[in-house]
From Swiss-Prot:
Role summary: Forms a proton-selective ion channel that is necessary for the efficient release of the viral genome during virus entry. After attaching to the cell surface, the virion enters the cell by endocytosis. Acidification of the endosome triggers M2 ion channel activity.
Glycosylation sites: N20
Native species: Influenza A virus (strain A/Swine/Wisconsin/1/1961 H1N1)
The protein's name in its UniProt record: Matrix protein 2
Assembly and oligomerization: Homotetramer; composed of two disulfide-linked dimers held together by non-covalent interactions. May interact with matrix protein 1.
Length: 97
């Protein structure tokens, strides 16, 4: 006798979802949260460049200069510019033969 004949296989009627008739609020809340999560994930994947670019560059502002004398502001600008100038020296030109 084969083991396959003794294995109980579910009938087609048992494969259906049994939670369709359920009025449990937890099931409804989980379904709503799942659908919202899916929608947000799709939007994130579609617009991630716009969203994260906005966060990275759009929301960045320099430190507040309110109440700071103009001479100190100019000194700060010069330091920032010199830092940028130093970074420009790190680029390496590679020429292929």
């Amino acid at each position: 006798m084969s083991l396959l004949t003794e294995v109980e296989t579910p009938t087609r009627s048992e494969w259906g979802c049994r939670c369709n008739d359920s009025s449990d609020p937890l099931v409804a809340a989980a379904s709503i949260i799942g659908i919202l999560h899916l929608i947000l994930w799709i939007l994130d994947r579609l617009f991630f460049k716009c969203i994260y670019r906005r966060f990275k560059y759009g929301l960045k502002r320099g430190p507040s200069t309110e109440g700071v004398p103009e001479s100190m502001r100019e000194e700060y600008r010069q330091k920032q510019q010199s830092a940028v100038d130093v970074d420009d020296g790190h680029f390496v030109n590679i020429e292929l033969e």
